């Protein structure tokens, strides 16, 4: 069998199995695809593909299904990621551009991506090691109670209510806010702990106790901003594809719930020349994802954070890759350089 025909037969098997979820036989391939050869020839071709470990027979079925190796060869033959339709691109743009802050952007992103792909969508929060302070706001809620708002240049907003330990008026709090903002605007969040003592020391002695409390609050907010987190949506899609996980869907759900597993997997996925990385079945380093595939790409400054989907290995890879790439591009555009 020639290499082009081998790839053509494999492509037809993958497409039919993804569409029907049924093992594929030679007769069906001849009827559905213009392969230009007889059913007997296709049977021989399928036997050769099976010998190479690219397809296999589930149980006693007469048909064949792709193996992880077969899916890998199929994905590797996708020379370029196809663009989404104009309607799909417009829907992405409309939904994401209505977002108000980073949390809202990422929540909308995973909901949209799970709808486009019918898989579980996941997105890492941008790595904030290089994020800087854009704005600080102090809001007086009661004489001793202040709402602290910290906004990073990535759009991330962190806030908490603290007791400043002494009574403050609006004017006094406004003065403290002005001092903190003037001193800290543009400061990397990672350097905030080192910068805060000097700000407190420069405050009037009568307000230093409150300034120390505000500094502790800002430090805590900066620390929570630096924690690695992700957002996901579409876990119900896994339940609908339960039959695609013959062993058990439990380990997949555990991997999603134990966010550190997914965060590590996403972080370790190298960028593919096509812009989208695919990890199939047992290529995943976590045993619980041996029956799953992950399609992801980077977004934002340096493309260091990832957005992607997780689903069964029986996945529409071309469509999924296109959706992931398109959403990542819009996400990067919204978040800016």
Swiss-Prot record:
Gene3D superfamilies: 3.30.450.40, Heat-inducible transcription repressor hrca homolog, domain 3 (3.30.390.60), Winged helix-like DNA-binding domain superfamily/Winged helix DNA-binding domain (1.10.10.10). GO terms for biological process: negative regulation of DNA-templated transcription. InterPro entries: DeoR_HTH (IPR001034), GAF-like_dom_sf (IPR029016), HrcA (IPR002571), HrcA_C (IPR021153), WH-like_DNA-bd_sf (IPR036388), WH_DNA-bd_sf (IPR036390), WHTH_transcript_rep_HrcA_IDD (IPR023120). Keywords: Repressor, Stress response, Transcription, Transcription regulation. It comes from the Bacteria. One of its GO terms (molecular function) is DNA-binding transcription factor activity. Signal peptide: none annotated. Pfam families: HrcA (PF01628), HTH_DeoR (PF08220). Negative regulator of class I heat shock genes (grpE-dnaK-dnaJ and groELS operons). Prevents heat-shock induction of these operons. Belongs to the HrcA family. This is Heat-inducible transcription repressor HrcA. It comes from Arthrobacter sp. (strain FB24). The gene is hrcA.
